[in-house]
Amino acid sequence: MFGGESLTTIDAKGRTSIPARFREVLVTEFGDERFVVTKASPVDFDDGSYGRGLSVYPLGEWQELEKKIQANEGELPLAQLNSLKRLVLGPAQECTADKLGRVLIPPALRIHANLGRDLYFVGMGRRFDIWASETYARVNAQDERNFPQDSAALAALGI
């Protein structure tokens, strides 16, 4: 499972280094160094703006997710399903890190996520996300506002 946060940078060509522990998880837990980069679910900042980042899925996880979306396992109305396909499936790019662990983030995805020099890689269990550092600060603040207050639910999760 992907866990933890790593602050890193992206160069002018759009290359960034995937944290070593994330690369290790790709190979040891998912058995493949290939992965798919796509748009992450936007975070509503409650002020009319949204935080946009990227989600990175191991190839096998992506293939399962893609099948679920295509089969509409979430039973979404057609308009929402088509939006999901356009926002998640459409921009998805299969990638592999080079021998130094670097990956080229496709230009359209860099623009979408407003990636500047400093990035956060954030482990999310079976995937990891990539955020511009400024956006991630706002995402964290929103997460604190959204954090569950139900102590029984948190206890059931072991938190």
UniProtKB/Swiss-Prot annotation:
Parts of the chain that traverse the membrane: none
Family: Belongs to the MraZ family.
One Gene Ontology biological process: negative regulation of DNA-templated transcription initiation
Gene: mraZ
UniProt subunit comment: Forms oligomers.
Alphabetized Pfam families for the sequence: MraZ
Protein's name in the database: Transcriptional regulator MraZ
InterPro entries: MraZ, MraZ_C, MraZ_dom, MraZ_N, MraZ_sf, SpoVT-AbrB_dom, SpoVT-AbrB_sf
PANTHER family, A to Z: TRANSCRIPTIONAL REGULATOR MRAZ (PTHR34701:SF1)
PROSITE patterns: SPOVT_ABRB
GO cellular component: cytoplasm; nucleoid
Cellular compartment(s): Cytoplasm, Nucleoid
Gene source species: Trichlorobacter lovleyi (strain ATCC BAA-1151 / DSM 17278 / SZ) (Geobacter lovleyi)
Keyword Aminoacyl-tRNA synthetase: no
GO MF term list: DNA-binding transcription factor activity; transcription cis-regulatory region binding
Alphabetic keyword roster: Cytoplasm, DNA-binding, Repeat, Transcription, Transcription regulation
All residue ranges annotated as the SpoVT-AbrB domain in the record: 5-61, 92-135
